[in-house]
Amino acid sequence: MPSVEESLALIKRGAEEIIQEEGLIEKLKRGEPLRIKAGFDPTAPDLHLGHTVLINKLRQFQDLGHQVIFLIGDFTGMIGDPTGKSATRPPLTKEDVAQNAQTYKEQVFKILDPKKTEVRFNSEWMDKLSAADMIRLAGQYTVARMLERDDFHKRYHGEQSISIHEFLYPLVQGYDSVALRADVELGGTDQKFNLLMGRMLQKHYDQEPQVIMTMPILEGLDGVQKMSKSLGNYIGVNDLPGEMFGKLLSIPDELMWRYFELLSFRDMAEIEDFKVQVNAGENPQNIKRLLAEEIVARFHGGEAAQSAHKSAGNQVKLGEIPENVPVVHLEESDDQTEFSISYILRRADLVKNGAAAKDVLGRGAVFVDGAQVDPSFMVQRGSEHVIQAGKKKIAQIFVK
């Protein structure tokens, strides 16, 4: 195993908070493999790169010689995590949870080493608890303490309903750590309350309390809101190689470094060198391409990563003009100096009519020189652009 200092440096990379870092150091000093737990409720069929922030950290623990427990919350998934919610979540059926759980297993082993991973389901122990056991578990915490949670506090004072089963969720998640005898538990910053519950319950059951590591919530493609399928700003683990590559090229330049730290396995010294190169004038797209190739290769293989940039849209994002792109010369007879993007799309036959132009612009599917534009974008007379409308229509356009 690496030294404690080397291990700690990798473990702390990108971490938001470690609760009882001294305890982690003591555990590492024993020189024995630790049991590292992270739980995922299978509430949707596919994972996105935001989920992989935790999974990447699990892989780093594996590389340091530790045992990872990838916990699928099939039982808690049917309760519904109330964290950050302003209303009670609708419960999932057993069939939904089982189907989603299967896809999770298929996706996570693109990152985790199967030989160092225990895949567990919390129904293994929760289904065996009697009503009396659940009441005893509920007796370990008070309603007053539960209402200290920010989301519960807001709902209570906003006179919005809170179901009793939602109070049980953090207790069940905490009990998972008891059942698994976890040494370390990982979670997002929004999970801190639930993670602390695990420490409290382990102490109650005379176990050494787990160390808690919280990881940041990854921003989505807009660089502002958290990555979320419902917000449409996500990169799915199962996205096609070209689509994944293109989305990664489209992130804001300043967000690239956050993605490198949380999603890349490159050494931080190398990433710092990339920053120096960009500050010295290197095109950020060239560095972003390295990030995109690494992540696409992780999920689709090296060959797919090498060819992913060859789609026309991705080449434009990289500042390249794809082969065999039609060239369109637009000669305007009036004295206008600028033209709406909707007008240019129609004139260049990239759309059939004004309604089609409105539709494709409304869907955010128009790109000028690789950058997404909205309906207000104007094209200047005398300019030259590569314009893409939707997935298939693209042209190099000269406006005279």
UniProtKB/Swiss-Prot annotation:
Location of the S4 RNA-binding domain: 339-399
InterPro entries with a match to the protein in the record: aa-tRNA-synth_I_CS (IPR001412), aa-tRNA-synth_Ic (IPR002305), Rossmann-like_a/b/a_fold (IPR014729), S4_RNA-bd_sf (IPR036986), Tyr-tRNA-ligase (IPR002307), Tyr-tRNA-ligase_bac-type (IPR024088), Tyr-tRNA-ligase_bac_2 (IPR024108)
Catalytic activity annotation: tRNA(Tyr) + L-tyrosine + ATP = L-tyrosyl-tRNA(Tyr) + AMP + diphosphate + H(+)
RNA-binding keyword on record: yes
Compartment list: Cytoplasm
Enzyme class, spelled out: ligase
Biological process terms in GO annotation: tyrosyl-tRNA aminoacylation
Coiled-coil residues: none
Region forming the signal peptide: none
EC assignment: 6.1.1.1
Similarity-based family: Belongs to the class-I aminoacyl-tRNA synthetase family. TyrS type 2 subfamily.
PANTHER family: TYROSINE--TRNA LIGASE, TYROSYL-TRNA SYNTHETASE
Description of how the protein assembles with itself and partners: Homodimer.
Function comment: Catalyzes the attachment of tyrosine to tRNA(Tyr) in a two-step reaction: tyrosine is first activated by ATP to form Tyr-AMP and then transferred to the acceptor end of tRNA(Tyr).
Protein name: Tyrosine--tRNA ligase
Phylogenetic placement of the source organism: Bacteria, Pseudomonadati, Pseudomonadota, Gammaproteobacteria, Oceanospirillales
Gene name of the encoded protein: tyrS
